[in-house]
């Protein structure tokens, strides 16, 4: 496992399973993985992951079809939504605050690193 992120009773990480890396969420009360339908896709490789305190939102950076992209997964509805970066850049690391409403993203633009703060609805 790598890129651990904790939110109250939740542990999100990137785990290797059957030769593939995938996002995994564990309920720390019982140590059991929680189903995440739609978050792990065959054509995508997770790079960084972060979970909100209530475990409902998971922010991730993944490589897909030669592009690196930022996405937000809402567990309550099972939806993975791509989040655009403005101005455009290559995301590398992500950190979601406890409320799941503010996202910090390390981004490379023209060879320079920066941190973007993104407010989420």
Where are these regions (language model features)?
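Short coil/turn segments that connect the beta-strands within blades of beta-propeller domains
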Residues: 8-9, 54-56, 99-101
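Surface loop/turn motifs at the tips and blade-to-blade linkers of beta-strand repeat domains
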Residues: 37-43, 84-88
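Beta-strand-rich domains and repeat architectures in extracellular enzymes and scaffolds
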Residues: 1-16
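Short loop/turn segments that connect beta-strands within beta-propeller blades
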Residues: 27-31, 74-78, 120-121
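Blade-level signature of beta-propeller repeat domains, shared across WD40, Kelch, NHL, RCC1
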Residues: 95-121
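Structural motif
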Residues: 20-24, 66-71, 111-118
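Beta-strand C-termini and the immediately following turn/loop, strongest in propeller blades
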Residues: 13-18, 59-65, 104-110
């Amino acid at each position: 496992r790598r890129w651990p992120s904790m939110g109250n009773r939740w542990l999100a990480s990137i785990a290797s399973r059957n030769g593939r890396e995938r996002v995994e969420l564990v309920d720390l009360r019982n140590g059991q993985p929680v189903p995440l339908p739609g978050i792990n896709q065959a054509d995508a490789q997770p790079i960084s992951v972060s979970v909100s305190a209530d475990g409902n939102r998971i922010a991730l950076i993944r490589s897909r079809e030669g592009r690196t992209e930022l996405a937000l997964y809402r567990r309550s509805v099972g939806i993975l939504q791509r989040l655009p970066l403005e101005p455009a850049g290559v995301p590398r690391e992500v950190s979601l605050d406890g409320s799941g409403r503010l996202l910090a993203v390390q981004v490379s633009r023209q060879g320079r690193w920066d941190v973007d703060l993104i407010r989420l609805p």
